Amino acid sequence: MDILFAQIQADLRSNDALRQSSALLQALQQSAAGRDISVIAKSAVEEIVASPASAVCKKLAFDLIRSTRLTPDLWDTVCSGVKTDLHFPDPDVTAAAVSILAALPAFSLPKLISDCSSEIASCFDSPSDNLRFSITETLGCILARDDLVTLCENNVGLLDKVSNWWARIGQNMLDKSDAVSKVAFESVGRLFQEFDSKRMSRLAGDKLVDSENSLAIRSKWVSSMVDIVWRKRSALMARSLVLPVETFRATVFPLVFAVKAVASGSVEVIRQLSKASSAAAAANATVVDSNAEKLVGVSDLVTHLAPFLASSLDPALIFEVGINMLYLADVAGGKPEWASQSIIAILTLWDRQEFSSARESIVRAVVTNLHLLDLHMQVSLFRRLLLMVRNLRAESDRMHALACICRTALCVHLFARESARRGQKPLPGTDIISLFEDARIKDDLNSVTSKSLFREELVAMLVESCFQLSLPLPEQKNSGMESRVIGALAYGTGYGALNWTEPALEVVEVCRPCVKWDCDGRTYAVDCYLKLLVRLCHIYDTRGGVKRLKDGASQDQILNETRLQNLQRELVKDLQEVNTPRILGRLIWTIAEHIDLEGLDPLLADDPDDPLNIIIANIHKVLFNLDAAATTSNRLQDVQAVLLCAQRMGSRHARAGQLLTKELEEYRNHAAADTVSKHQTRLILQRIKYVSNLPERKWAGVSETRGDYPFSHHKLTVQFYEPSAAQDRKLEGLIHKAILELWRPKPTELTLFLTKGVDSTSIKVPPTAYPLTGSSDPCYIEAYHLADTNDGRVTLHLKIINLTELELNRVDIRVGLSGALYFMDGSPQAVRQLRNLVSQDPVQCSVTVGVSQFERCGFWVQVLYYPFRGARGEYDGDYIEEDPQIMKQKRGSKAELGEPVILRCQPYKIPLTELLLPHKISPVEFFRLWPSLPAVAEYTGTYMYEGSGFMATAAQQYGASPFLSGLKSLSSKPFHRVCSHIIRTVAGFQLCYAAKTWHGGFVGMMIFGASEVSRNMDLGDETTTMMCKFVVRASEASITKQIESDIQGWCDDLTDGGVEYMPEDEVKATAAEKLKISMERIALLKAAQPKKTSKIEEESENEEEEEGEEEDDDEEVKEKKEKEEGKDKEEKKKKEKEKGTFSKLTAEETEHMALQAAVLQEWHILCKDRKYTKVN
């Protein structure tokens, strides 16, 4: 291999173009085979890029550079070579040099563009088609990127040049050369796409913070290109028709985007964002006569595109045209025919099984635009789409498509019903039962076992969609795709609070067979189903039977309630066929809690098919089922649920009470019952007996239905890693994500600007920078980082200032990594070479890295600067100057760098919280998930807060209480605040937060706070120390391990240094000390209190003394006195009773008593701990 590499290097050094090109081809082959060719790349840079060579060799050398890593020194050489090539007389060599601009690293590109702007501009006027093509393609890639926009923001001269370059690219769309025209269309399309998605900037590794100016710059470019395309649309459409058919596809998107921007009016907002002065805006603005002209522009474009849907043979072109016509169908005045034409063409691709690589894209395109079709077409496509979705491989695409389909089903159902109510002819097949009538879907739902997860996804998605429909619909201010859907749903529900229950009722009927499924221990889909069923039973109050017309019930309500009652009867029969032990107890609870016991047929009392008998037989089955393993059933929970059902059913209905008493007596005396269950059963039996004796006091054993489903698919901590539990969690995550993306989408920044206009709150503030060097160091460096959660990347931005009075010719910045960070190109460290640093002139550079997992990580920066850099070494020797070999050596000889001065900087640590994302979750879901999380970390922290007496309590009505001051910064951290409970007497609280790591792990955090009462016991004094107990639970042990490895660091990340960590030993010691002091004080208080005695007692004492002195008193007198005392005592007791329940204790005394009780209780616990430690 060394011989081959030596041969290639020798060929590169020769001046023979043929040998050089074959050597470069060989090197490229070696690179493609995965070998390290950095040695050859160095030779190629020095011998070909930095020297005159043929266009072919230059192109091959640049391809070689792209396929390997170069050092910063070599990149410098490449840049100087490119500068010389831009002046080269052969346009092909210049074209090759221009093409490498897009591959230059972000730290060297801006300077090159600034230095060579005039040469770049002259390339547009070149007679060579190749050079015009190269410059249009390269600039189209670079100019839309974030880093270039930021460069223009800081350099007004460059901004004007780049704006002119965009205008030239726009003109090139009408260029005489087909290749140039096509690539100009692509470049303009890329600018439009980048405006919305920022995809290219992320690929370049620079996700910068959008400032107001950078947004204005990009908006200016976009609005000017939209104007160009709109003004010249007829010429551009004609030019695109003359292009070869295979390149026509590139022309579609720019035309469609610009025409839609003008027709929908969004170009006006883009102009406002660009902040152009009113005169300039007036000069550039397109004068549009009326809406009619806009509509004509749109229909012209549709007429131009439509023939390609029918006649084209290229699947990619049909797809592109179809997608863009759907985009146009959404414009005000767009026709459903445009949408139906496109969707039919796209579905034909599916039928022809062409374009199979884009199956997901085809389905996504169709399902997201279903609402543009008329009702007939939606219904006719429905079953077909359902089968298409079933066959999708990618989970996220399948979920999104399924969410769209479920929403469409609800839309169609509601819309058709409402239209029929308003007197229109009802359309057959629009109800949910008919839409899901397909034989294959029915078979899947009705079979007990199934290998695919699709049926579970379908049931869960339908149910979750119903719950979304029950929530208020999101407001839509702009017209667009979403507003049509929301309009249809609002029309269908008639803005009525309970109209969503009609389609939900049909969903519950369609999905009924799911309770019989055997899903290998998975329960998420069935839990979702039962949750919806419980909600509907609660809303329609099925416990109270079917309401009547004379009670004020409407016909629809009576019909719905009858259907629900019948469904309950069917489910009772299904109890015999339930195949998942976990589900049996839950289904019994769902039915028993809501069934109408009064409405049961008394004639069937002895019949085994009587619903009550079936329910009680299944309760018996759950109570006495000892064989089930802990993994398949949750016996503890099932028994609790069933006992609760028994109590409530027995209290509601006399016959049920009799039957259940027998069952419970048997269970109580059976070995299956543990001690707790026996006690509970005894209590339940007493309640049933009490209610049977006093029927008017049923409330003792029954409570109202709440509509809440108390079970969850989350299993115990021990079972967290079980496959079925993991699949359930994954399915839940996918479904929730798809539902939220569809029903409650987060608006993009652009959408926010288009709807709300320019609002400074939506523009991010750059983060604060931290100095990494000391104030006396010759180079000052400060740094800040930006995290891009989409791609899992972190960018470190450095600002370097030369604090010496000399100009530093060269400064190297080396960046190393620790923890989970890695460079995208796999190199061990990054080096940025900065040249000619003028004194006090700040220079910026950045490093982008990936993050592989949730772990503490940091950047380690080292500065090498060369204050003694000498001049170029002279070549001494008596050779002839003209010798080409000597000339080459002279050119290649490097200037002497001299000895570098090395400056090590402070490490830049990435806070752990930066690797988290807020996870929105409801309190109910949070508390159900909490016990199942296996990894736990607990620690105590303290902080001081200002305030005294009443001001320090949470009882303030207005203004923030000072006692949460130490946790203020939590609001800016990536945690979702699930709920908070504040104790409103002294400062005590419980806060719950939820987050997810970038890699999907769940982190839940609870903070319990208790204010420390100051030294003397009176509450009027200052209470300034807050003790916080932090409990963190996570789905993976590695997460809590990282937190526990440096708890103070984690506290600082969370609270910006507000909370100080207290080790457990200190906590126990301080608690013991405080308790000791408190006990002493209580003893002193008790000793100091004078005994309160009544007058009667004093009198009796006096009498006793007198008796001691005078022994000869009469016994009768004594008896009389005792009787009087007895009467007095009775009267006093009566008076106390008459006073009522008001205590004689004052507030302070009550507080003291409460404190004493708490102190004693804690004292006992500490004593127990001591005994335990002694024993151990």
UniProtKB/Swiss-Prot annotation:
The gene is TPLATE. Residues 1098-1116 have a biased composition (Acidic residues). The modification Phosphoserine is found at S1100. GO terms for molecular function: identical protein binding. SUPFAM superfamilies: ARM repeat. Residues 1071-1156 form a coiled coil. Keywords: Calcium, Coiled coil, Cytoplasm, Cytoskeleton, Phosphoprotein. This is Protein TPLATE. Residues 1117-1149 have a biased composition (Basic and acidic residues). It is found in: Cytoplasm, Cytoskeleton, Phragmoplast. Functions in vesicle-trafficking events required for site-specific cell wall modifications during pollen germination and for anchoring of the cell plate to the mother wall at the correct cortical position. The keyword Phosphoprotein applies. Disruption phenotype: Male sterility due to the production of shriveled pollen unable to germinate. GO terms for cellular component: cell plate; cytoplasm; cytoskeleton; cytosol; nucleus; phragmoplast; plasma membrane; plasmodesma. Residues 1088-1149 are annotated as: Disordered. It comes from Arabidopsis thaliana (Mouse-ear cress).
